Design a protein with these regions (language model features):
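Predominantly soluble domains enriched in secretory-pathway, periplasmic, or organellar proteins
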Residues: 1-188
Length: 188
């Protein structure tokens, strides 16, 4: 089954075989949503500024925690979720289980927005829309360590990673462009 957050309907749709089979209640303006293995589903509620954890099998809400001053996007790696707290200029890491727990945060001045995970290399990539930058964090150890910064196209809203070679792709709605960065060294 698949899950989709309805940002303007305040629901999470459960989809099987291309059909909505259930609508789960969600907080006001659910934004980013991400699977955590096959057991949990993590959801960012933009307006309520919380992270919810659903049981992906029973569809029940298991836990809720504060997600900062303005969370917008979420990605997962293993049993951890990484959240772009756009208004707080912070990247937050949560351990996801029946009770989500914030385990780390790092400053990301410049309005962090887009976020992507490179699971093979244990990296998190974040776009900074106010400064037109891409920041790379190593998450291989207990801390999130910034290892690279790259200039980007204007208004870098979306980011994704090629899992094969680690190239990072950034999209700009403002510019209507797609930029590719092949990480090497430490960036700038």
């Amino acid at each position: 089954k698949l899950f989709a957050a309805g940002e303007f309907s305040d629901t999470v749709s459960v989809i099987r075989d291309g059909k909505v089979i259930e609508s789960l209640p969600a907080p006001v303006q659910p934004g980013g949503i991400a699977a955590v293995g096959d057991r949990y589903l993590a959801l960012i509620a933009v307006s309520e500024r919380v992270l919810l954890v659903y049981d992906a099998r029973s569809n029940e809400v298991l836990g809720v925690t504060d997600a900062g001053t303005g969370p917008t996007h979420i990605e997962t790696l293993g049993d951890e979720a990484y959240v772009a707290d756009t208004e707080g200029d912070v990247i937050r890491r949560f351990r996801i289980g029946s009770k989500p727990v914030e385990t780390a945060k790092v400053a990301a001045p410049g309005t962090p927005y887009g976020i992507a995970v490179d699971s093979r290399r244990k990296r998190v990539w974040v776009t900074l829309t106010a400064t037109n930058r891409l920041i790379g964090y190593s998450v291989a150890g207990p801390e999130m360590k910034k290892f690279a910064t790259y200039p980007t196209i204007r208004q870098p809203n979306s980011v994704t990673v090629d899992p094969g070679n680690g190239d990072v792709f950034i999209a700009s709605r403002t510019e209507g462009q797609l930029e590719r960065i092949s990480p090497g060294g430490d960036g700038e």
